[in-house]
Regions:
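Repeat-blade elements of multi-bladed beta-propeller folds
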Residues: 74-79, 121-130
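Beta-propeller blade termini and top-face loops
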Residues: 131, 141-144
Length: 231
């Protein structure tokens, strides 16, 4: 048994308040992309379908002896380049292929996890993505926003601070709205440029009445896992 899933283009920020946002397939007027997976998710194929040819062509094939997760395919340069999210080396990372599925280069690598691609600036050839586990002195589940060039160079952290960050990148990839919080801190929203420079504080929650009523933040603590090593 297998499952087919249509790849679609990322939603634009200018459409975020629309009741019905347009869903557009990833591709062009003649071709679209889909993911074909086995029921056990040991086998995942990224495929293309050309209108009128009535055939599904595998472009990127993933084979593992364990369950795999997937993320949406990013299509660049008029369909001539593809960015794939994959867990093939045990960590979730990004890889660049040409339209025929030939490997071009690895974009990210290391003992950390790429969560999602938020924006690809095709003109500048820069990818904005969220990831966690890169900062050893922070909670490994806290996500940050990063940028990296399509060729794998220029990796840079955009958001800062030991918080869980929920960033949004504008459609032109010039600005970032970073909503960040932690269980023992006051939530805050700030405006950054695409290099991580803080431009302004948009809003910081007011907990004064809550604190006056006797509220106390939960206390964070650290314990060892069953292996006696992992915090």
């Amino acid at each position: 048994d297998q499952t087919l899933g249509l790849e679609y283009k990322p939603f634009l920020q200018k459409h975020r308040d629309m009741e019905y946002r347009p869903v557009v397939w990833q591709g062009d007027n003649n071709r679209f992309y889909l993911t074909r997976s086995s029921r056990d998710l040991y086998r995942i194929d990224v495929c293309s379908y050309t209108i009128g040819q009535d055939s599904i062509v595998p472009v990127i094939e993933e084979r593992m002896n364990t369950y795999q997760e997937t993320r949406g395919l990013q299509v660049l340069n008029g369909g001539k380049e593809l960015i794939q999210w994959s867990e093939r080396d045990g960590w979730a990372h990004l890889y660049l292929y040409d339209e025929k599925g030939n490997f071009k280069n690895r974009i990210t690598k290391g003992p950390w996890h790429v969560e999602n691609v938020l924006k690809v600036d095709e003109k500048a050839r820069v990818i904005y993505f969220t990831a966690n586990g890169m900062n050893s002195d922070e909670n490994p589940y806290y996500e940050h926003l990063y940028r990296v060039n399509v060729d794998g160079t220029g990796l840079k952290q955009i958001t800062r601070g030991d918080f869980f960050h929920q960033p949004e990148v504008d459609d032109d990839a010039r600005f970032v709205v970073d909503n960040y919080s932690r269980v023992n801190s006051i939530p805050c929203a700030v405006l950054l440029d695409n290099n991580g420079n803080r431009l302004m504080t948009i809003q910081e929650s007011d907990f004064s009445q809550l604190m006056a009523a006797g509220y106390q933040f939960p206390e964070l603590f650290k314990v060892k896992a069953a292996d006696g090593v992992t915090d």
